[in-house]
Amino acid sequence: MATTRDYGLGEFTFPRGWFMVSDAASLREKPLSLRFFGQDLVLYRGKKSGKPALLDAYCPHMGTHLGLNDTSYVVRDDTHIDGDGIRCPYHAWRFGPDGKCDDIPGIKGPIPKAACVRSWPVHESLGAIWAVSYTHLTLPTKRIV
């Protein structure tokens, strides 16, 4: 059992492993805002691949929550989920399932490496979306279910 002290997060304990974060049927066109592992997260299904992706919830540019918005043009124009990425509702930066920013509208040239969010390993099985509670350790190589 890991403690949050092991990760510099305080005194709470949490188990290491895979956890069901959503049933697969709930993951449709809109991203889901979740809180797991002491983090605000956003879960979405890529339109291109159909695969789920789980990212830290806040854009590194201005701190906007990637999943909580119903009024921005990105959401109204149905470009919130763009290909296999998700666009920030504020300035439309697009983050891929690996957490890297791969498009900044109006910017030509290289995208800074710091323009990224943490990506969490996910697996879809048994009608559920599973996420692993640690991102810095080696993942199991065998199927979980």
Please give the residue ranges for each predicted region.
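A boundary/linker detector
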Residues: 1-14
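Short amphipathic alpha-helical segments, especially helix-boundary/capping motifs
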Residues: 15-16, 38
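Rieske [2Fe-2S] iron-sulfur-binding domain
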Residues: 22-134
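Conserved small/polar residues in nucleotide/adenosyl-binding loops
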Residues: 135-141
